[in-house]
A protein has these predicted regions:
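Conserved acetyl-CoA-binding loop-helix of GNAT-fold acetyltransferases
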Residues: 90, 96-109
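A short beta-loop-alpha structural element at the N-terminal edge
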Residues: 3-16
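Hydrophobic adenine-recognition pocket in adenosine-nucleotide-binding enzymes
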Residues: 8, 88-93
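Conserved acyl-donor/pantetheine-binding loop and adjacent beta-alpha core of acyl/acetyltransferases
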Residues: 59-87
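Glycine-rich phosphate/pyrophosphate-binding loop shared by adenosine-nucleotide-utilizing enzymes
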Residues: 3, 53-57, 83
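Active-site rim helix/loop that mediates acceptor-substrate recognition in acyltransferases
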Residues: 25-51
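Conserved GNAT acetyl-CoA-binding A-motif
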Residues: 111-121
């Protein structure tokens, strides 16, 4: 029952889109075009897998990324270098099971070697 964090694969994007759009009001909805843009441009786009099933995903961008989020722009105006977590989504049936904790540990390990600041909304 271990959690595996790994890079997303192209054939999983439909499942990621469904996870995102079923996550509730705290997560902005995505369409397929925007999700594919994330896939092509995000510096960090990883999924969590538990028991062979998709359990969630996290998308992040470095400060030099061409990302169109107003929240990202706010950080860009204030910090010269940072890594921005755009969204983290955990499948409802996997919440409370350590998936979010595993994601934050992984993204922190990734970002701390590359950026002086880790940011999110």
């Amino acid at each position: 029952m271990s959690i595996v964090i790994r890079d997303v694969r192209a054939h999983e994007l439909d499942s990621v889109l469904a996870l995102n759009n079923n996550a509730g009001l705290a997560i902005l909805p995505l369409d397929s075009a925007k999700l594919h843009r994330f896939y092509e441009t995000a510096e960090y786009f990883r999924v969590a897998e538990r028991d062979g099933n998709l359990a969630g995903f996290l998308v992040g961008f470095g400060s030099d990324s061409d990302h169109d989020s107003s929240n990202f722009a706010w950080f860009r105006e204030r910090y010269p270098q940072f890594f921005y977590i755009d969204r983290i989504v955990v499948a409802s049936r996997r919440r409370g099971g350590g998936v979010g904790r595993a994601f934050y540990a992984d993204v922190q390990s990734y970002a701390e070697l590359r950026y002086p600041q880790l940011a999110c909304e």
